[in-house]
């Protein structure tokens, strides 16, 4: 069966079918509300750091440190959510993160020392590190397995609206104060915590049969799984470089916060359009999932290099457009492939590891932008992209025919 076909017809029909499920629509809305603070994080942290210290570089450190915390916590948190009531645990974790983000807002307004700002950013990220994986676990209990790929495709498109709304919301509220973006993140995170409790019934999430217990003992790690984690890492690094650099790139072009937001909106709009086309037409695309992923990784790098030229608006816009066109299709490809490579009973742990790998990529992007000159930082992903693309040629790392 193709990635985008099911036993009852083509993907277009399955997209309509999954959208007709009330439980999926509730999950979709809740998932976006949970993700919205993540979309707000880069610009909100940069502006909070600028308001507190007068320099955006502390924001890069906060982003890198928070992403590193997610890497360390995502897998253990995923295991916890796998073995407990995912809804209740995710809700409490989100409430805790909302409190910490509120404290970070106050700390930024009072210009607390940078180490404390970084510490609060790390704590908030640690609390929410496993929640995206938990939401994926809840999705698996919300839609039939045959509708999972269409559900992911729709989700991948809708995510881009969140990517657009996040920076726009930050830009709107920072007119009040530079720390208002993080304050809005706190409020939205608290609202997401409340909505998570109204999702799939607990028995769909926590019931554990003897067969599930046995499945937990199955191996999780395999060479193809490691390869796809690497693909997720490199993709996140390239996307992160484009997103986090939007504000300094806008400044080099003579613009400001609004210019940065518009660049991010362009990226997100391109990603949403590409994701929609990919969800409906990927069955007609040539090559395997791995081959398509490699092509999109190369496309991401081309876009980032164009951004790095800082040669005026045309090349910068082209760079953000190319990055956007590759983003949603690549994310959908990675998630759907990881889903098939792991035992179902360890899905949340696997998605936690995927979150961790993308967190590493995002941390590398934030660290590069904090420590290196802007142009050097932007081309830093060339090395990791080259290594990842070369690794895909190794026979031992390739999935079997039924997994591509």
Q: Across the structure, where does each feature detected by a protein language model lie?
A:
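Helix-loop boundary and gating motifs at the non-cytosolic
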Residues: 9-71, 219-265
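Hydrophobic core of transmembrane alpha-helices in multi-pass small-molecule transporters
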Residues: 32, 113-130, 233, 315-329
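Intracellular juxtamembrane helix-capping segments at the cytosolic ends
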Residues: 45, 129-143, 246, 329-342
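Helix-to-loop junctions at the C-terminal end of transmembrane segments
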Residues: 70-86, 174, 273-289, 373
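C-terminal ends and interior cores of transmembrane alpha-helices
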Residues: 95-111, 298-311
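Cytoplasmic helix-loop-helix junction between adjacent transmembrane helices
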Residues: 120-161
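C-terminal transmembrane helical hairpin of 12-TM major facilitator-type secondary transporters
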Residues: 288-332
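A late C-terminal transmembrane helix in Major Facilitator Superfamily
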Residues: 345-374
């Amino acid at each position: 069966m193709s990635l985008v076909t099911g036993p009852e017809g083509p993907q277009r029909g399955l997209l309509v079918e999954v959208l007709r499920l009330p439980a999926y629509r509730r999950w979709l809305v809740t998932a976006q509300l949970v993700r919205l603070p993540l979309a707000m994080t880069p610009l909100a942290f940069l502006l909070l750091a600028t308001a507190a210290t007068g320099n955006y570089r502390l924001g890069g450190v906060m982003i890198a440190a928070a992403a590193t915390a997610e890497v360390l916590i995502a897998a253990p948190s995923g295991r916890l959510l796998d073995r407990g009531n995912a809804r209740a645990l995710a809700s409490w974790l989100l409430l805790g993160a909302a409190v910490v983000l509120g404290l970070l807002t106050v700390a930024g307004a009072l210009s607390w020392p940078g180490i404390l700002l970084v510490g609060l950013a790390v704590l908030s990220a640690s609390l929410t590190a496993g929640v995206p994986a938990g939401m994926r676990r809840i999705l698996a209990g919300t839609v039939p397995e045959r509708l999972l790929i269409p559900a992911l495709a729709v989700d991948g498109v809708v995510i881009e609206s969140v990517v657009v709304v996040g920076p726009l919301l930050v830009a709107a509220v920072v007119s009040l104060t530079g720390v208002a973006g993080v304050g809005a993140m706190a409020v939205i995170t608290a609202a997401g915590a409340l909505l998570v409790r109204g999702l799939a019934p607990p028995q769909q999430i926590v019931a554990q049969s003897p067969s599930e217990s046995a499945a937990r003992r199955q191996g999780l790690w395999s060479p193809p799984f490691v390869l796809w984690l690497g693909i997720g890492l490199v993709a996140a690094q390239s996307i992160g470089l484009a997103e986090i650099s939007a504000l300094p790139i806008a400044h080099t072009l003579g613009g400001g916060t609004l210019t940065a937001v518009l660049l991010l909106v362009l990226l997100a709009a391109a990603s949403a359009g590409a994701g929609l086309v990919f969800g409906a037409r990927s069955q007609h695309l040539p090559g395997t999932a791995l081959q398509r992923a490699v092509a999109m990784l190369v496309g991401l790098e081309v876009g980032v290099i164009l951004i790095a030229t800082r040669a005026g608006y045309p090349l910068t816009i082209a760079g953000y457009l190319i990055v956007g066109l590759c983003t949603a299709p690549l994310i959908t490809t990675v998630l759907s492939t990881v889903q098939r490579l792991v035992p179902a009973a360890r899905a949340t742990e696997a998605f936690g590891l995927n979150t961790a790998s993308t967190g590493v990529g995002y941390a590398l992007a934030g660290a590069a932008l904090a420590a290196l000159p802007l142009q050097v930082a932007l081309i830093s992903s060339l090395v990791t992209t080259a290594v990842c693309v070369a690794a895909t040629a190794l026979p031992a790392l390739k999935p079997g025919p039924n997994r591509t």
